[in-house]
Amino acid sequence: MQLKALLEPLVTRMGYQLWGMEFRVAKHSALLRLFIDSEQGITLDDCTEVSRQVSALMDVEDPIQVPYTLEVSSPGVDRPLFEAGQYARYVGEQVRVRTQWPIDGQRNFAGAIVSADEDSVTLDVDGREVRLPLEAIARGRLKGTLPPATQVEE
């Protein structure tokens, strides 16, 4: 069973969206990172509770055969993008994308999302449109911007 198919129903039942997941294997260990989201935002307590529930399920199902660390967090301001619908949700926003292989001689792209469908994402990179097949995208991330700090008058 795929990890997403195992974990997404649990996270959804808890009232959260499984925004995405990363699984990285190093020489002697692995890291499973889950990104959760909700309309109300995510707190540290939310992450802790999801971590507890996911850990219990993983102990029973045992889908990972190497020692691993589980991390649960919110996607944050510069949230990673995993699926076509996530790119479509942020049309007009600035992103950074790295591809698995060169496209037009490069692998790193930064620009605004023009459009996204189930097959590709189109970016405006310095005034030219670049179409990136979803299967080519290794990593995509919003270029997050924080709102300006409000000044407190004394």
UniProtKB/Swiss-Prot annotation:
Superkingdom of the organism of origin: Bacteria
Stated name of the protein: Ribosome maturation factor RimP
Species of provenance: Thioalkalivibrio sulfidiphilus (strain HL-EbGR7)
CDD domains on file: YlxS_C (cd01734)
GO cellular component, one term: cytosol
Purpose: Required for maturation of 30S ribosomal subunits.
GO biological process terms on file: ribosomal small subunit assembly; translation
Keyword Cell membrane carried by entry: no
Family: Belongs to the RimP family.
